[in-house]
């Protein structure tokens, strides 16, 4: 199931559809207002039934998949399991405090503490059982008016239930800001051409640390510096310089531009003498005209036409 909020839920449905393209069957559940993660979980009670389940927050990107963690939880009698990751700024996250005498035990969990003595962030992946629904029913809204997942986990522990934790290996990124999305893009692209490369579709080729989609045409009068990904049915015309750290979506046309450390989503057209850096260009956008040689940084929404 995918839980949809009140910000453009139709865009999520438009992208994933019924899930057939991804080999799954998707049920959509609506959370009309942002009342907290625990509130969103409670909306899934009927969908979950008596099964164990995983809650995965959509703005999380992990280097390692969840297979090993899922097997560990499924074969156990745990009431919950959380994943932890060491961070430099714990005040931005829910933070777990482990027992000094027994590091396998969690003492408590606090949401966005101001002065934390722990650097173990609770990442947005929660392994739960239906016991959590009864816990959520007894929660009170936090100071920001939401039913917090950290409060639910703390109450679950307070009632004597068993919560385990595991530490994430590899990187983890919370993509809550444009800067975070750009950084996550760099982390993903760094896997190209390595043993740890993310899976790509069968009709996509990989050359060194550059991935090029099918039916994409690249002019000889252009240059690509990896790591980079170029989608299907793209046209990279003359005078284009791409990379490093560039992701280009399907159906894009680029001409006479330079793009570095940026994400350009599908069906975009850039035919401007512009030097883009650290930018995110949403799908079906168009940039044309002429700019100076200085570096430009843009954050453009869908179907934007920017004339320079």
Residue ranges and their predicted role:
Residues 25-27, 105, 162-164:
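Conserved beta-strand segments of alpha/beta enzyme cores
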Residues 1-57, 61, 66-68, 75, ...:
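Conserved N-terminal catalytic core of the sugar/cofactor nucleotidyltransferase
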Residues 62-143:
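Conserved core of the sugar-phosphate nucleotidyltransferase
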Residues 1-6, 83-84, 263, 280:
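Short internal beta-strands
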Residues 59, 86, 177:
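Active-site glycine-centered loops adjacent to acidic/histidine catalytic or metal-binding residues
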Residues 7, 130-131, 179:
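Alpha-helix/helix-capping structural signal
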Residues 12-16, 136, 184:
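Hydrophobic packing residues within well-ordered alpha-helices of enzyme cores
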Residues 138-308:
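Left-handed beta-helix
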């Amino acid at each position: 199931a995918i839980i949809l909020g009140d910000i453009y839920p139709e865009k999520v449905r438009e992208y994933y559809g019924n899930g057939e393209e991804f080999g799954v069957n998707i049920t959509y559940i609506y959370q009309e207002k942002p009342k907290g993660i625990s509130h969103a979980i409670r909306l899934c009670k009927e969908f979950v039934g008596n099964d164990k389940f995983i809650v995965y927050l959509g703005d999380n990107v992990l280097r390692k998949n969840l297979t090993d963690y899922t097997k560990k939880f499924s074969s156990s009698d745990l009431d919950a399991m959380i994943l932890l990751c060491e961070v430099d700024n714990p005040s931005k996250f829910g933070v777990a405090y482990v027992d000094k005498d027994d590091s396998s035990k969690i003492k408590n969990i606090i949401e966005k503490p101001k002065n934390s003595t722990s650097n173990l962030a609770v990442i947005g992946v929660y392994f739960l059982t239906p016991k959590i629904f009864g816990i959520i029913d007894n929660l009170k809204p936090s100071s920001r008016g939401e039913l917090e997942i950290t409060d639910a986990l703390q109450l679950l522990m307070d009632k004597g239930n068993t919560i385990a934790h595991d530490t994430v290996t590899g990187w983890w990124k919370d993509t809550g800001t444009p800067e975070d999305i750009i950084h996550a893009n760099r982390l993903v692209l760094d896997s190209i051409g390595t043993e740890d490369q993310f899976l790509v579709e069968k009709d996509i080729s990989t050359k060194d640390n550059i991935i090029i989609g099918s039916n994409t045409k690249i002019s000889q009068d252009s240059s690509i510096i990896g790591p980079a990904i170029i989608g299907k049915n793209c046209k990279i015309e003359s005078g284009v310089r791409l990379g490093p750290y560039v992701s280009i979506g399907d159906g894009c046309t680029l001409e006479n531009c330079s793009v570095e450390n940026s994400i350009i989503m599908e069906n975009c057209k850039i035919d401007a003498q512009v030097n883009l850096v650290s930018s995110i260009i949403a799908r079906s956008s168009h940039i044309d005209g002429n700019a100076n040689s200085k570096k430009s940084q843009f954050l453009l929404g869908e179907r934007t036409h920017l004339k320079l």
